[in-house]
């Protein structure tokens, strides 16, 4: 640990390398934890590459898995994954701020300029304030999401398992990770007719997708006219792609009997809305993706690419 500490805080090691090394270390430790027999329900050793892929996906909130998380991993293993999702969801700059706050180190000019440009602040005081706001907002929104989801999960799974499901999926949605522990390998397909679950997850995904800088701007300005250009562009783009995406999916899948063709109009709109919100980044599914039309798959690619350019 002393060697790691010296490496992380060596004066010649720049901040980007420190954070990169920190994330790599977290991913590796997470993989080793998932390999332990206690992490699997069958109490078997998970192959290293499978564990490493899962922890990398969780930390980078991509949502890709080689293993059915809900069916394979135990409560301990799921908790490790959830911790990594939360850590990854906080983001690069937030972790950077926390590192400086905890270590009580002064930020150099180069790092100060990097943080100022990214966060829109020029002082360490502003950075500390933003980091605290990020932690508070994240905790509050994820808690509210878990409470709403518990309305469905607790009656179905019992109090403790239901609350765990609620917390896990709330955090996963808010961090745009897309991990689920339903256990049937079909993501949210079993809740495709449940507006409470789908809308709650979609709202969490949308709010989380705005980013911390936009939240801080909204909290500080409290008025649309006073928001900076960056915040307005992100908010309007989010609304645009959700609305247009919903409409496009609704049209393209309207007559597809393998997806929403046999559903009522209301259920078609709900499924199209959820697909539009989650396709861009979150990865939750309420439809079987292989059954989508080719045009819908192409549109999904457009939505995912749009995230890169915003």
What does each of the following model-derived ranges do?
Residues 1-308:
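Membrane-proximal intracellular helices of multi-pass ion channels
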């Amino acid at each position: 640990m002393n060697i790691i500490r010296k490496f992380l805080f060596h004066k010649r090691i720049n901040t980007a390398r420190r954070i990169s090394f920190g994330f790599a270390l977290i991913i590796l430790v997470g993989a080793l934890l998932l390999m332990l027999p206690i992490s699997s329900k069958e109490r078997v050793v998970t192959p290293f590459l499978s564990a490493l892929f899962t922890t990398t996906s969780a930390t980078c909130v991509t949502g890709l898995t080689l293993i059915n998380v809900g069916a394979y991993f135990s409560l301990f293993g799921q908790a490790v994954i959830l911790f990594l999702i939360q850590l990854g969801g906080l983001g690069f700059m937030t972790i950077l701020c926390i590192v400086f706050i905890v270590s009580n180190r002064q930020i150099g000019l180069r790092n100060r300029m990097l943080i100022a440009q990214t966060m829109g602040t020029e002082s360490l005081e502003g950075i500390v304030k933003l980091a605290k706001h990020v932690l508070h907002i994240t905790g509050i929104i994820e808690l509210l999401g878990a409470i709403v989801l518990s309305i469905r999960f607790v009656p179905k799974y019992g109090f403790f398992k239901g609350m765990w499901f609620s917390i896990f999926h709330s955090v996963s949605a808010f961090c745009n990770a897309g991990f689920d522990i339903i256990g049937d390998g079909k993501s949210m397909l079993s809740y495709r007719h449940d507006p409470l679950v789908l809308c709650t997850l979609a709202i969490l995904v949308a709010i989380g997708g705005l980013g911390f800088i936009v939240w801080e701007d909204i909290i500080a300005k409290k008025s649309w006219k006073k928001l900076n250009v960056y915040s307005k562009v992100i908010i309007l783009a989010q609304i645009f792609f959700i609305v247009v995406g919903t409409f496009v999916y609704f049209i393209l899948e309207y007559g597809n009997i393998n997806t929403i063709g046999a559903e009522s109009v209301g259920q078609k709109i709900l499924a199209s809305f959820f697909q539009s919100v989650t396709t861009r980044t979150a990865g939750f599914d309420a439809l079987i993706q292989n059954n989508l039309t080719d045009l819908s798959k192409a549109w999904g690619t457009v939505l995912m690419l749009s995230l890169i350019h915003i």
